[in-house]
Swiss-Prot record:
This is Large ribosomal subunit protein bL28c. Signal peptide: none annotated. It comes from Spinacia oleracea. The gene is RPL28. Coiled coil: none annotated. GO terms for molecular function: structural constituent of ribosome.
Amino acid sequence: MAASGMLISNPSNVCFRKPQFSCSLKPKATVSELGFLTSQLSGIQISPSPLFPIISKPISAPLKPSLQPVARRICPFTGKKSNKANRVSHSNHKTKRLQFVNLQYKRVWWEAGKRFVKLRLSTKALKTIEKNGLDAVAKKAGIDLRKE
């Protein structure tokens, strides 16, 4: 059995005293005082001050995902992307699979910029660049090579 209080005396003669609390549960402010307080605050107008300009930017930055984004398997020059195909077993059981584009990282000489540009492109786009030139293929695809 649990009881609140202090044990005074020996264990054979048990006596519990009531604990004395110093805080009272009575409200300190009366209704008239609260009414007076609200009447004082009723005339105050809260508006932006020239001393404290309104901050247009959010104070906290949005949370970013902890995982880094994976590079998409799409060729930026030709627009080629993965093909959905079926893997067919001997018993003709079909399961879905992806046939990825043959993307390669390649350093290509850019004649107009007089420098090498490192690109991730498909082997088909590489053949097209060798035939037509990097500027023509990039212009047709809408790619700005100055950023790369």
